[in-house]
Amino acid sequence: MYKRQTKNGIKTKNNDFNFDKIIFATGYDALTGPLLSLNLVGKKKTKLQNFWNKSPKTYLGLMIPNFPNLFIIQGPGSPSVLTNVPVQIEQHVEWITNCLNFLNKNNKKTIEPTINSAKKWSDEIKRLADASLFMKAKISWYKGDNIPGKPKVFIPYPGGLPRYRNICNKVEKNQYKEFLIK
C-alpha cells in the first residue's frame, strides 16, 4: 500500500522503492484523444476535430456520421471502460464483422450512421449519465475534466453491457436502418 513519496522513490507499508524517475500517468485524453490525434477527414473534408468540437458524436460508439466505413472499437459512446474490456472488444469485433458481411451480401460499399441516430444516442448517454452518480463527480476523466478545453460531456455509454448488446443486436436484426448504406 502506497504511503508517500520519498526523496529517492516511494515508501509503501512494507518497503522502500528507489527510482531514478517517477512518472505520474495522469492527463490522458481518454476515449477521444487517440481518434482526434489521427487527424481524420471525412466526407466534404469534414475534420473530426471540428465535428467533435462540442462533444463526440457516434452511434453506438462504433461509427461516426460523415465518416463512412470508419469502424471504432471501444470508442466514445460505447460502454468501453465501464465494462469488462476484452468482452466488449469481442462484441464490437463480432458486430463489425456481421455488418461487413451484411454489406458484402447486399453488394453495398459504404455505411455510416445518420446524424439523427448519433444525436439520439448522445441524448440517451446523457439521460443515463444524469440519472447516475457519475455526474456527481466534480472532476472526472469520464467527462473530459482532465483535459483543458475538452468538451465536458459524459463519454462512455453507462447503460451496462447486457443492455448495450441488446441494442446492437436489434440494430443488426433491423438491417442497420439507423445508417446510410450505399
Task: Specify the residue positions occupied by each region the protein language model found.
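Detector for glycine-centered tight turns/loop "hinges" at secondary-structure junctions
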Residues: 14-15, 44-47, 107
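Structural alpha-helical scaffold elements that stabilize or flank donor/cofactor-binding regions
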Residues: 15-16, 63
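Residue-level detector of beta-strand face positions
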Residues: 9-11, 39
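FAD-dinucleotide binding site
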Residues: 17, 46, 54-57, 115-119
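Short hydrophobic core segments
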Residues: 10, 17-29
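Conserved small/polar residues in nucleotide/adenosyl-binding loops
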Residues: 1-5
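C-terminal, flexible cofactor-proximal segment of oxidoreductases
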Residues: 58, 69-182
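Glycine-rich loop(s) and the adjacent beta-strand/alpha-helix scaffold that form part
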Residues: 29-78
